Amino acid sequence: MAVRRWAGLGLAVCVAALVWMGYLWYSANQTSAPSHQDPEELRTLLKLGNEVVDVPQRLVVKWQGDWEANGNQDAYEAAEGLSRSLNLPGVQQLTEGGHLTYRVVDTKNGVNVRFNWQEISEDRSYIIIQMEAAGDEQLSALTELQSEYGQALHENGIDAEWNASLQGTVKGEHPAGSTMKAVEDGIFRHMAATKAETYEDATTVSNAYEVPSLRSGIQSGGKVLNMQVAVHEDQSTGSSRVTIGLPVITIEY
């Protein structure tokens, strides 16, 4: 996967699908499957964020996976059942991109939750549940929801994986490259990481890493990427925006 700045929501959706495909390859080729709901990796991301970026932080976590009909429920019934098991309101039905979609937008303990279930075919659907928070209390609540939602997806027969992106700013006018060096120094103090891919332009530096201690990963060529870091200079404010993704970034940076 090329490591570059995602431009726009449509591309972000494509990236999410590519992440899921990479997860499928990675999980299928593991002798022991990675944990589907390892809260320690999310706490590791928060710890890194507290060290390398200034507050406020924005954290986005996405669960995503496939559902296949088993003859007992149609997609609408299954979407309603999953929404109830997540303690969310009933789904709203709409058509998006020519596909029936069932959606819920809600807030849980200050965490913004977006539930999206889209029918791909008569007996197959694709689900993305996104949680977003900022601030210490909300970040703690999101960590709990991440684990709860992973368990609920599993109990509803959906083999899902999660990814997370943390975003914050670094004050002061510094080139993206020097900010990236400072961020990397913080990462290397906590874990062994090997740079595997890199992208750079006039205002952005993005690196992807192999991190053996992290169990979540995505296949990219002959490598398994476990973490992506991007630094983007905001020329209007003079500060730099830092985004850290496990295993890769799936929001615009």
Where are these predicted regions, by residue range?
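Soluble, non-membrane globular domain cores that form compact, hydrophobic packing
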Residues: 4-46, 143-160, 179-195, 231-233, ...
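Beta-strand elements of well-folded, non-transmembrane domains
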Residues: 67, 133-137, 170-172, 233, ...
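Extracytoplasmic/periplasmic, Sec-exported soluble proteins
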Residues: 67-74, 137, 141, 175-179, ...
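Extracytoplasmic beta-rich ectodomain segments of secreted or membrane-anchored proteins
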Residues: 80-176
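A cross-kingdom marker for long, charged
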Residues: 214-253
